[in-house]
Amino acid sequence: MTDNIHKHRILILDFGSQYTQLVARRVRELGVYCELWAWDVTEAQIREFNPSGIILSGGPESTTEENSPRAPQYVFEAGVPVFGVCYGMQTMAMQLGGHVEGSNEREFGYAQVEVLTDSALIRGIEDSLTADGKPLLDVWMSHGDKVTAIPSDFVTVASTESCPFAIMANEEKRFYGVQFHPEVTHTRQGMRMLERFVRDICQCEALWTPAKIIDDAVARIREQVGDDKVILGLSGGVDSSVTAMLLHRAIGKNLTCVFVDNGLLRLNEAEQVMDMFGDHFGLNIVHVPAEDRFLSALAGENDPEAKRKIIGRVFVEVFDEEALKLEDVKWLAQGTIYPDVIESAASATGKAHVIKSHHNVGGLPKEMKMGLVEPLKELFKDEVRKIGLELGLPYDMLYRHPFPGPGLGVRVLGEVKKEYCDLLRRADAIFIEELRKADLYDKVSQAFTVFLPVRSVGVMGDGRKYDWVVSLRAVETIDFMTAHWAHLPYGFLGRVSNRIINEVNGISRVVYDISGKPPATIEWE
């Protein structure tokens, strides 16, 4: 019998902060299960979830506006600890009898918070001391409004020069509010504060660990599918690979993986997928060579969005055909992860909503009435990688840079041809190999090569030749929403360029993309 890893759980209500998913990830890192719901959740839903504690996130709205979001009143009547962060603190203060005002002085960035009163939330936590021995905390502020009066049964725990109520608390009810972001690394003791709230105040055990998550997933898969057969589209990417390994552990040969080789993969990737999952791990894999079919469908097409749609359509067609060949398959497995599940709400604020499946694979034939198995749907990407390591997948495969779903179809600009893909594969492999050799691969967030459908004059021996151009692209980013181009050493870039031009017959020029995002996107198409 596996432990109930969902026994202790934190509910995070989202008011629209860009950091809300980070709050959830931090709670998970503490070994505690949590879910992220929209702020306009009902009392019945909260009761059914039965949280051990509730966190109210930050948000971009102003609590002083008439129709701004509010926490359900039941949050403060449920008898569990509540932790308000920024906007969450402000709405808590207002709803419980305090006062919030817009501030002329927007506080954004580092601040030092002076601790005035002892509190269970920060007891023994400090970054430095004042001259008279009071604890100081280095925190990250991001707010315009501020609490100007706290509810009558709260005490002021800490303040800054411009923010009189930086931390407030009602120790009896276990309600806490902070006017800064404990979830970001800039708040140096933020993780300790979250740990204090989740583990000590809410008394949650650290049950959410990779080994226990695997045991729980295996048990749930077996309970869901029994002795039925399951099909999975295996791409070799992180999510589908970890899904395959979990299902294989749970049901063994009752899993059939369909690997569609579309001719748009990286150098030797198809062989690596078959060797690793077929030969090494012993999974049941159907290898479908479909390069000609994909390239034929893409012939003559230059528009990036049209190319994406063609690749998606042909994949579904090929997968459907293979699925129909298998007998008695009752379940379709997908590598849906938790961020896929968090979707925009149809509520007034458009905040994150949960509980709706995001389907990665398109419509299966209507005659195939299959159930859906999504063993990763509670997990963030970093958790999926940790699970993969625990299941024996290699680190280099789990932590390699992102690769687009359409593959080289969007890294060959314009029309996609086999000749272009073959040249690009080899050039890209050289770039990645050199990054690894120079210990630069893990220092950049994403690196790849782009094929440009233009010929450039080159000199080879005593003759001139017109051959193709490729661009190297490497970026540094935290969230992939914005990115800086990576300042790779000139000597390194020269070495990569020389190797590509000398070793890949058909490429005469190598350029380096120095565009940031924005205005450019990370991928060229």
From Swiss-Prot:
It comes from Salmonella arizonae (strain ATCC BAA-731 / CDC346-86 / RSK2980). Pathway: Purine metabolism; GMP biosynthesis; GMP from XMP (L-Gln route): step 1/1. It catalyses: XMP + L-glutamine + ATP + H2O = GMP + L-glutamate + AMP + diphosphate + 2 H(+). InterPro entries: Class_I_gatase-like, GATASE, GMP_synth_C, GMP_synth_GATase, GMP_synthase, GMPS_ATP_PPase_dom, NAD/GMP_synthase, Rossmann-like_a/b/a_fold. One of its GO terms (molecular function) is GMP synthase activity. PROSITE patterns: GATASE_TYPE_1, GMPS_ATP_PPASE. This is GMP synthase [glutamine-hydrolyzing]. Its EC number is 6.3.5.2. Residues 9-207 form the Glutamine amidotransferase type-1 domain. HAMAP family: GMP_synthase. The gene is guaA. NCBIfam families: guaA_Cterm (TIGR00884), guaA_Nterm (TIGR00888), PRK00074.1 (NF000848). ATP binds at S235, G236, G237, V238, D239, S240, S241. The keyword RNA-binding does not apply. Catalyzes the synthesis of GMP from XMP. It comes from the Bacteria.
